[in-house]
Amino acid sequence: MTDFFKDIPAIRYEGPDTENEFAFRHYNPDEVVMGKTLKDHLRFACAYWHSFAWPGGDPFGGQTFERPWFGDTMELAKLKADVAFDMFERLGVPYFCFHDADVRPEGDTFAESTKNLEEITDYFAEKMDATGVKLLWGTANLFSHRRFMAGAATNPDPEVFAYSAATIKSCMDATRKLGGENYVLWGGREGYETLLNTDMARERAQAGRMLQMVVDYKHKTGFAGTILIEPKPQEPTKHQYDYDVATVYGFLKDFGLEGEVKVNIEQGHAILAGHSFEHELALARALGIFGSIDMNRNDYQSGWDTDQFPNNVPEMALAYYEVLRAGGFDTGGTNFDAKLRRQSLDPADLILAHVGGMDACAAGLKAAAAMLEDGKLEAAREARYAGWSEGLGQKLLTSDLAEISDLVIAKGINPQPRSGRQERLENLVNKYL
């Protein structure tokens, strides 16, 4: 272990009454819920970028964090890895996630950047063997460098498309080498600032071609993980093409990839798109493309994607209810795509932020499991649609408009509204929180 987190103990479960801030109150990794441990249900992962690469800047000010690993050398990249895996061990998280740019210095050429990535992932492999920590997913940063200012796959310059494709290949290779369970595509610059200089049809076709190549390369190389798209409506672009789950599904259908690609849904991105987190999860489940989640929260007053650590247990209970209804995670998990506030300078802040987030998620999942096991919500849902399971409902599904019109006249059908009982169900949910 490094000395960055010196005097901070390994985090253990001590129960809800503990006064020890460096302990879990709700997350007992070995606790069995619905036949599975919380560790296996939640599949926690730490995000390398926010925890170890973000300098603490915002649109109005620069760096506030002073980390001993900040710099552009392989030596510092390895120090960063030492500290990262130290934190993973102290928290007991089973997974981590990274972009290429988070973990290796940028080279003067693509070949040099790739060599740096290969070297640091060799170092990661040693760390992973020593600690047992695994890779939930890898991805490519195709949005920070100025070459990507007009997009990656959707860029008007074919050379940027080529550079992006090569970068994705190198990151998929790194993910496969480390046994990553997913590969994520987030199109931060895959959108537009103005329609005045944008050929949307062309850009959409380019994005489709890139995704097809990603899927082809997955099969060619035998990558056993899941390809995931992470929706977001805007920021940093005015409009992003993978706006939300529904938009992504339409895109996948258009290119015949709905059976190949799933979604990684972020709480903050759902809010930016005008949805609740549970809406996006429920829709992904209904469409058969639910894959993984990025857990965080937004400041609802500012309207920005603030990437704060989650702390709202009722919100998380409703989210994990949809995750459990989807059968839980397969290759996916709960990645903390969350960052400290820029005034939270101390090493302890980074540990405590994750402790609080993990506890809140555990409390939310246990509440969701209790709701599901109790069965009252599902029973109410089934009762509401019971008419479609027999008799008239089944007949309507195999009839045409003329037949149904004749039926309404013959039977004198004159339907009367029934209560949706929303308040009753909301009261029921509060019983478990």
Curated annotation (Swiss-Prot):
UniProt keyword annotation of Isomerase present: yes
Signal peptide start and end residues: none
InterPro entries (alphabetical): Xyl_isomerase-like_sf, Xyl_isomerase-like_TIM-brl, Xylose_isom_bac, Xylose_isomerase
UniProt: Mg(2+) 1 binding residues: 230, 266, 294, 337
Recorded GO CC terms: cytoplasm
One GO BP annotation of this record: D-xylose metabolic process
Reactions listed under catalytic activity: alpha-D-xylose = alpha-D-xylulofuranose
Main localisation: cytoplasm
Residues binding Mg(2+) 2, per UniProt: 266, 269, 305, 307
Free-text cofactor note: Binds 2 magnesium ions per subunit.
GO MF entries: magnesium ion binding; xylose isomerase activity
Subcellular location: Cytoplasm
EC numbers on record: 5.3.1.5
Top-level division of the source organism's lineage: Bacteria
Gene3D superfamilies named in the record: Divalent-metal-dependent TIM barrel enzymes
Pfam families (UniProt xref): AP_endonuc_2
Claim: DNA repair is one of the keywords in the record: no
Enzyme class, broadest EC rank: isomerase
SUPFAM superfamilies: Xylose isomerase-like
Cofactor(s) it depends on: Mg(2+)
Record key words, sorted: Carbohydrate metabolism, Cytoplasm, Isomerase, Magnesium, Metal-binding, Xylose metabolism
Family: Belongs to the xylose isomerase family.
Quaternary structure annotation from Swiss-Prot or TrEMBL: Homotetramer.
Listed NCBIfam families: PRK05474.1 (NF003998), xylose_isom_A (TIGR02630)
The protein's name: Xylose isomerase
Lineage start: Bacteria, Pseudomonadati, Pseudomonadota, Alphaproteobacteria, Rhodobacterales
